[in-house]
Amino acid sequence: MATYVNNLRLKEITTGDEDGTWGTSTNTNLELIADSLGYNTQDCFGSDGNQTTTIADGSADPARALYFKVTSTATLSTTRELTIAPNTVSRVMWIENATTGSQTITIKQGSGATVNIPTGQTKVLYLDGAGSGAAVVDANANVAADGVTSVAGTGTVNGLTLTGTVTSTGNLTLGGTLSGVSLTAA
């Protein structure tokens, strides 16, 4: 009997099974691998309530995608939870909150840590697949950048610590409390 215990929910054919038909299962698995590296959209919130999306065993499913755009036909009235099942899947996902109602969605997998994604934002997450206690973690929460880093546009940064020389071309607006700052005009 085939099983689906892997992280991509692919069909694992038992030795000796599917004599003469294994090619169909293999082709489906290859299509699902391609799906897992792509982009997909799913209306996860057809109603204004917490929801679960399940990565299907051995068949196409939007939640299998690496980049997963979450939408809603319902207007969300408050922060809503989206549980990604099964809770044994360990993987990395980019999840975009494209829901209506200007609400945050909370991504969860089990009773462990969760990640909030504000409306209009995308986060890179990893699901640890630890079963009932599974956690979802923001993969970029503690990213360090060495060397030259360039940022364009307008943004808000909280809790920023800079060391070394910081060069700005254009306007730089700082607020809050500054300490130990030495400014040099170019």
What does each of the following model-derived ranges do?
Residues 119-122:
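Tight coil/turn sites that cap or link beta-strands
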Residues 126-128, 165:
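Short beta-strand micro-motifs enriched in acidic
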Residues 130-133:
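Extracellular beta-strand-rich, repetitive "passenger/adhesive" scaffolds
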Residues 46-50, 59, 67-73, 103-108, ...:
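Surface-exposed, low-helix, low-complexity loop/repeat segments of extracellular attachment proteins
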Residues 94, 124-126:
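Residues within well-ordered beta-strands of beta-sheet-rich folds
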Residues 1-9, 13-105, 186:
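Exposed extracellular interaction/assembly regions and N-terminal maturation sites
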Residues 113-117:
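Short acidic-glycine-tyrosine-enriched beta hairpin
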